[in-house]
Amino acid sequence: MPHFLVLNGPNLNRLGKREPAVYGSKTLTDLETDLFQFAERANIQLTFFQSNHEGDLIDALHEAEEQYDGVVFNPGAFTHYSYALRDAIASISLSVVEVHISNVHKREEFRHHSVLAPVCQGQIVGLGLEGYKLAIRYLVSEGGAVS
C-alpha cells in the first residue's frame, strides 16, 4: 500500500479562520479527515504533519525519505524564499508535489515565484483543497520515487 506524507507549512493550521474568501471555510482537520477518507477508499496510507517552523519542515522532508513513497507539500509562504527547503527537497530521492490552495499567480506579485517548484515533480495551484487529492493521484500513478 503506498504511503505518502502530506506536509503543510506556516499558517495552514489557520485554515477556516484565515482569509476564508481565499482559502475557504474548511479547517486543517476537515482537510485531513477528507483526505483520510479519500485515501482509505483508494487503499493509500497518509500521514499528516503541519508546522509553522522551517526547520521542522526540513526535518520532516529528510525523515520522509526512509518512511514514505512521496510527499504532498503545501509550503505556504516559504515557497517564495526558502532556499533551505529547496535544498531539503533536492536532497531526497522522493517525488514532492507542491500544492497551493489559492491561485498564487492571481495574487500579490511576491507570490508569483516559487523557489521550490524547480526541485519538485510538479506544482498544483488554485484548485482549492482538491489540489491535495490531485497530487496524491499523481504520486500513486508514478510510484512516488524520483526517476
Curated annotation (Swiss-Prot):
GO terms for molecular function: 3-dehydroquinate dehydratase activity. Its EC number is 4.2.1.10. It is an enzyme of class 4 (lyase). The active site is at Y23 (proton acceptor), H100 (proton donor). PROSITE patterns: DEHYDROQUINASE_II. It catalyses: 3-dehydroquinate = 3-dehydroshikimate + H2O. InterPro entries: DHquinase_II, DHquinase_II_CS, DHquinase_II_sf. One of its GO terms (biological process) is quinate catabolic process. Pathway: Metabolic intermediate biosynthesis; chorismate biosynthesis; chorismate from D-erythrose 4-phosphate and phosphoenolpyruvate: step 3/7. Substrate binds at N74, H80, D87, I101, S102, R111. The record marks R18 as: Transition state stabilizer. Keywords: Amino-acid biosynthesis, Aromatic amino acid biosynthesis, Lyase. Catalyzes a trans-dehydration via an enolate intermediate. Homododecamer. PANTHER family: CATABOLIC 3-DEHYDROQUINASE. Belongs to the type-II 3-dehydroquinase family. This is 3-dehydroquinate dehydratase. The gene is aroQ.
